[in-house]
Amino acid sequence: MSVYLLHLASTHAHFHLPELETLAKIENVEFWLIPKSEYLNVAFKSDKSRNQALFSHAIKEFQDSISPNDATTQNPFMLAVVNSNEDARRWIRRSIFCKGIYEIYCIGDSFTRLHEKMKELNPAPWDSFKHNSSYKFTFETFGTRRTMKEQLSIISDFEYMQLQGPVSMHNPQHVFTVLENRRNNVEGPKVYFGHWCGSGSRDAIDTFDLKQRSYIGITSFDAELSLVTAQMAMAAPGKLIYDPFVGTGSFLYTCSFFGAHTLGSDIDGRQMRGKNGRSIKSNFRQYKLSPFFLDTFTGDVTNCPLRKNLLLDAIVCDPPYGVRAGAKKIAKCSQRPPKESSSTGNHYPKLEQYQISDMVYDIICFASDRLVDGGRLVLWLPTITEEYGIDDIPSHPYLSLIYNSIQPFTHWSRRLLTFQRLPRAHDSKSLNLLPKINNKTPSHHNFREKYFSSAGRASASTKFSPVLE
């Protein structure tokens, strides 16, 4: 077991821990977070029971460091205990928020103290490869930047390491990294030194950048959060993932990027089909992910044509809020169908308005029927900040809410809810009709009207459309 430092992005901090825990489950990696109070004490790294006891403290500490206004963190460095370098690499290799992971050699509140502690290491962790292996030094700073002159001066102070191998800036065998948090208001250690183990997949954000996508619409979802949605769905090879509000397919691309097979549906087939040769299919060709795309169909989540015994590994969706796109469903027909259907020509079902609170209820009921045991429903839900309460979160006896991550705006928020299907062996045979979200009206009821109310207009300056974010 060793202590590792995670260098995280400073934005969307509410999503960091859920992603890390989900990736650990996907890769079957065991880890423990370390609270700041223990950062200068790495002697406990092999004490498994103590690590577990400190885990909850570290989580609370990280959550308290998140700004409530913009969901940023003042300290993007997090320490964790992991079993091996290989586990550390596998753990964060597909992470969207983790820039890199480093095996930590020393931590100090200043460079002077760092060097003192480094010289006390016996044996030094780099002794086994200091003679013949190529290497280089890199810097990661938060809060400011180091000039090249400053970097060279700091590197020269590590001469006591007596590294005798050649320097290789392009293909080194070992990378030593100095990480520094130079924010004045940050308490605790300011300087970290370690050995680079691996990087995340933040370059995927550029891959799926909406500005580079051939076909988008007004509901196309931000690339970074689309990738996180796929992470929370545990998208991976061999998985089948469905989006019942597919729109222009943002979630399908990112789920397929991680190897899952995807399909989607929407009440309005025009967005899926596109025009002038640009469509969901053309985007799959652009990303070279066509083998993972099954198909799309025009349909309604309340009248889904998928066969009942088709179980899904995950359902991902961003239901229409009624702001950029209206929510509709197929209306019940009060008339009998004509006897001779051939004489009627094409038939288009009548649609009616769909209240978002009713839609959410239908989604979780659908998910409880169609998910495999342990499958996930990953759902984006808008909430009004001043009215938000625990009753806003939908519940179902067969689904367990495991994550509730928030993206705050001015007067409203967008929450990423992650539910997990409980084992069917424990299903109640007497369950008939579920109460609609605890029999209380959630704050997202009539969300459109609230959004465009006086409070809503004040927040309209906040970029709403994921296309513009």
From Swiss-Prot:
<keyword id="KW-0819">tRNA processing</keyword>
<keyword id="KW-0808">Transferase</keyword>
<dbReference type="GO" id="GO:0000049">
    <property type="term" value="F:tRNA binding"/>
</dbReference>
<dbReference type="GO" id="GO:0005737">
    <property type="term" value="C:cytoplasm"/>
</dbReference>
<dbReference type="GO" id="GO:0002940">
    <property type="term" value="P:tRNA N2-guanine methylation"/>
</dbReference>
<keyword id="KW-0963">Cytoplasm</keyword>
<dbReference type="GO" id="GO:0008168">
    <property type="term" value="F:methyltransferase activity"/>
</dbReference>
<dbReference type="InterPro" id="IPR016691">
    <property type="entry name" value="tRNA_mtfrase_TRM11"/>
</dbReference>
<keyword id="KW-0949">S-adenosyl-L-methionine</keyword>
<comment type="subunit">
    <text>Interacts with trm112.</text>
</comment>
<dbReference type="GO" id="GO:0005634">
    <property type="term" value="C:nucleus"/>
</dbReference>
<comment type="similarity">
    <text>Belongs to the class I-like SAM-binding methyltransferase superfamily. TRM11 methyltransferase family.</text>
</comment>
<dbReference type="GO" id="GO:0043528">
    <property type="term" value="C:tRNA (m2G10) methyltransferase complex"/>
</dbReference>
<comment type="function">
    <text>Catalytic subunit of an S-adenosyl-L-methionine-dependent tRNA methyltransferase complex that mediates the methylation of the guanosine nucleotide at position 10 (m2G10) in tRNAs.</text>
</comment>
<dbReference type="Pfam" id="PF01170">
    <property type="entry name" value="UPF0020"/>
</dbReference>
<dbReference type="InterPro" id="IPR000241">
    <property type="entry name" value="RlmKL-like_Mtase"/>
</dbReference>
<dbReference type="GO" id="GO:0160102">
    <property type="term" value="F:tRNA (guanine(10)-N2)-methyltransferase activity"/>
</dbReference>
<keyword id="KW-0539">Nucleus</keyword>
<dbReference type="InterPro" id="IPR029063">
    <property type="entry name" value="SAM-dependent_MTases_sf"/>
</dbReference>
<keyword id="KW-0489">Methyltransferase</keyword>
<dbReference type="InterPro" id="IPR002052">
    <property type="entry name" value="DNA_methylase_N6_adenine_CS"/>
</dbReference>
<keyword id="KW-0694">RNA-binding</keyword>
<protein>
    <recommendedName>
        <fullName>tRNA (guanine(10)-N(2))-methyltransferase</fullName>
        <ecNumber>2.1.1.214</ecNumber>
    </recommendedName>
</protein>
<keyword id="KW-0820">tRNA-binding</keyword>
<dbReference type="GO" id="GO:0005829">
    <property type="term" value="C:cytosol"/>
</dbReference>
